[in-house]
Amino acid sequence: MPTINQLIRKPRSPKPVRNKVPALKGCPQRRGVCTRVYTTTPKKPNSALRKVAKVRLTTGIEAVCYIPGEGHNLQEHSVVLIRGGRVKDLPGVRYHILRGVLDTQGVKDRKQRRSLYGAKRPK
């Protein structure tokens, strides 16, 4: 524990703020090309096959991104738009792919929360 005098001489330095989405370089979204589309399994209490894609961004960075919703049409060389937002039970997945934008189709037969999944209003 420092003395008051030591703190006056050299005050405490604030902890540096760590960027949670470095690949976006301060932008809300970024465009990229899928280099690999695959499934992976989540951390311990959960069990599933989560759909993820490795994306090479326009910044030149490769990021692992989650594909939300049921079913998707992504394959290698698909052009996608990604946003920040991690997946809690997938380590290393810090980005989400936006549905219904560029080469990604919206989720079929989606009735609620449609805007998040790029689904049109049902007739």
Swiss-Prot record:
One of its GO terms (cellular component) is small ribosomal subunit. Coiled coil: none annotated. Pfam families: Ribosom_S12_S23 (PF00164). It comes from the Bacteria. PROSITE patterns: RIBOSOMAL_S12 (PS00055). Keywords: Methylation, Ribonucleoprotein, Ribosomal protein, RNA-binding, rRNA-binding, tRNA-binding. SUPFAM superfamilies: Nucleic acid-binding proteins. Part of the 30S ribosomal subunit. Contacts proteins S8 and S17. May interact with IF1 in the 30S initiation complex. With S4 and S5 plays an important role in translational accuracy. Belongs to the universal ribosomal protein uS12 family. This is Small ribosomal subunit protein uS12. It comes from Caulobacter vibrioides (strain NA1000 / CB15N) (Caulobacter crescentus).
